[in-house]
């Protein structure tokens, strides 16, 4: 493109941008929230107990106790997480709260009653550290930041974290006490960890320093967007084989299955870890909301029933993701500037996000331009520790909550802003 042509094209884009600004749009692609239609799929939860509060063991769900969760929910969670019921705790509505408690318990009290608290292991001048595959989940990183735990980014590829890098870091530094993971349809890049990567994760306990924990946040275990979804190897089973089960903490929930703000959460680990967690949990609560657990079990029943529900979720979500990809393909595919593509993007087989990469140094500018045109995006850098994307390229797109019309409008603006930001660099 000649200089004159480039200037004319830039002016055309500016004119279009100003026309969009005049519309005063108010569109939001920031968070991976279920849409109202998805929440409505589980409206039968309301009133499902019909006055019958008896759990499978005969206990009354309305009363105190049952810190581990009701038996039928523990059995269900075991199937969901690939665990044994004896290895499972069922909690309240927030899996993030479970993860926060796991980390804070270890930090202040130790991973078990005889272990040194993480904060006391560092000694003078040292610091406790966590490995953070990046880009990753911003709320994981917030837990570390709140506790003053140093975060070390780990490179990701299409198979998961760079395990050579993970293993090398662990061998070199016993003060690395954990690693964050979203192993299936990772937030935000949609990666599913390969069998080899999961197998190497299961052996990390043999490499790491004492009291190391893998926080395996399997938030999207059944959240597929394709007909034949990829499978994730079972970390718990592999960890048992390698004798490292104490190092694995697997987390899940129904937050994007039933009601996002009123679901139930799951945690699986060694029986010793679960027992230690319950001991500390008992200081803060006499038991979870077992009525909510019971109504979930009456509604979800078993994994085949859950998968039928997830198909209904997919029917709602899939057209939204297809529309996002349609705009990216038609608006940006094949276009280059200075010999480089205007952007690259993921095609997730599940989960809640599409990850877009701009040319280096442009993500924050694209987000700012979109905001100026009435489209809110997750702030650039949010998916990295300390909110610092070293290349300033990652933008997370979350199309689950808005309707198709809103996504259509928002993606037109997004494509325009990517092209405009690239030409103006």
Language-model-derived ranges and their functions:
Residues 366-372, 410-415:
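Short amphipathic alpha-helices in soluble, non-transmembrane regions
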Residues 217:
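Glycine-centered flexible beta-alpha turn that most often forms the glycine-rich phosphate-binding loop
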Residues 54, 59-210, 221-243, 415-425:
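Conserved core of the PLP fold type I
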Residues 355-361, 377-412, 416-417:
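Conserved PLP-binding active-site segment of the aspartate aminotransferase-like
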Residues 91, 239-318:
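Conserved core segment of the aminotransferase class I/II
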